[in-house]
Amino acid sequence: MMTEAKPQTVHAAFRQAAARWPERPFLAVLPETAERYGIEAGEITYAAAAETVERLSVGWAKAGFGRGHRVALLTENRPIYFLTWFALNRLGISVVPINPDLRSAELEYLIGHSEIAAAVVL
């Protein structure tokens, strides 16, 4: 009996799950969440998530980002946070999550010391 190879990265684990369960839900967006962020409510399947992750990672790569870069994410708890995180991870980019509740001094310190090359803010 053959077993699947153990994924070596978070993105590899995601891709393995997406290949195994493409039509299963990956994320669920509740109506309250959808209303708050102006996005569509419902489920995002692994297949749809994998397609978005691929498209986002291609865009980041074309923009010159790759292994060794750091990108800050300030997107609150939206689906795009997770999709962008997987896209960046695919390229070896480190994610610097930013809590939207940080005070200005905390935010200044985090940005000043994390050596980010870009930030995604929504």
What is the meaning of each model-derived region?
Residues M1-A12:
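Flexible, non-catalytic linker and terminal segments flanking ANL/adenylate-forming cores
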Residues K6, E23, L27-R78, F82-F86, ...:
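Conserved AMP-binding/adenylate-forming core of the ANL superfamily
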Residues Q8, Y37, E51, S94-V96, ...:
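Residue-level marker of intrinsically disordered, low-complexity segments enriched
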Residues T9, T45, V121:
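Ser/Thr-centric signal marking residues that sit
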Residues A12-A13, A63, R90-L122:
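Structural core segment of the AMP-binding/adenylate-forming
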